Amino acid sequence: MFEQEMYDVTIIGGGPAGLYSSFYCGLREMKTKLIESQPQLGGKIHVYPEKMIWDIGGVTPISGGQLIKQLVEQALTFNPSIYTDEKVLSIAKNDEGIFVITAESGNIHYSKTVIVAIGGGILNPQKIEIEGAERFEVSNLNYTIKSYEKFKNKAVIISGGGNTAVDWALELMEVASKVYLTYRKDQLSAHEAQITELTNSAIECHYNSEITKLIADDQEGMIKAIALTNHETGTITEIPIDEVVISHGYVRDKELLDNSPLAIERKNDYFIAGTINSESSIPGLYAAGDILHHDGKIHLIAAAFHDALHAVNSAKKYIQPDASDGGIVSSHNDIFKQRNRKLLQESLK
């Protein structure tokens, strides 16, 4: 365990809200640290890196993976301290009003303010409940789709009946040789339009059924077939398969808020109840992105940037009450003067 230097602001969470907060903290000349529990920055967008995102103002359709790349590059503009693979367990406040952030690693971080930007929380996929299944996670048992190329010309089965499962099935139909969908109930829970498209597709659906056995090729360490059990008839169907995709939802880890001794007001036992200015019930602690809840809250990536601006400006005013309410716009901000000259010179080459 080691103790670290003081920061003006510590951002917990490295998704869109946290990354943009990092950039804007730098613009407001705050000493900034960002802590992310996963090994990489980007947040939940890593679940759909090849999905196209259309609803960010001024940004033409962009893949999730490319958006992460650009957000990270922007977040690093002012050289914040970045800690990845660092899970925060609790946030406390000492007698001097300083936030004490304790990580699972034993590290203790100190900060004048905190911005919580953990989105829907640390989300862990619901694993398939078959003994020994985890050994196939390095080969052809998947809990997300990071690249469609992996599934090209392959037989794929998807287990799940929600929006994500059906969406993946429809998209994989374009690249896979055969797509199966299995769901334990008789009706899917996806959107009606998705179900209609699925019904009219070549995807083979098995309802009231679930995967009960993974049949392996022990020499290659891969699944070569699955056994489907129909709960109504008891029929067991064996299907040869190249890739298995499990979409059973996620388990939300709310350990951070539960463990923190601060009386952070919550909504629905998880979300931080706040204001349009991203303030929480704890002075100096702010929230941005999907973790924040208030009556006017919009759950879009674009709205996460808006939350980040409010959170950073509120944090700046908290530690420096005479500071301006907002930062100077980038087009007229001297902080970018040298960078703008460099960009201009490069454009003239």
From Swiss-Prot:
InterPro entries registered for this protein in UniProt: FAD/NAD-bd_sf (IPR036188), FAD/NAD-binding_dom (IPR023753), Fd--NADP_Rdtase_type_2 (IPR022890), Ferredoxin-NADP_redctase_2 (IPR050097)
One Gene Ontology term of the molecular function aspect: flavin adenine dinucleotide binding
Binding positions for FAD per the UniProt entry: E36, K44, Y48, V88, L123, D290, S331
Enzyme Commission identifier(s): 1.18.1.2
Keyword terms: FAD, Flavoprotein, NADP, Oxidoreductase
Needed co-factor(s): FAD
SUPFAM superfamilies named in the record: FAD/NAD(P)-binding domain
Family: Belongs to the ferredoxin--NADP reductase type 2 family.
Binding partners and assembly: Homodimer.
Name used for this protein in its record: Ferredoxin--NADP reductase 1
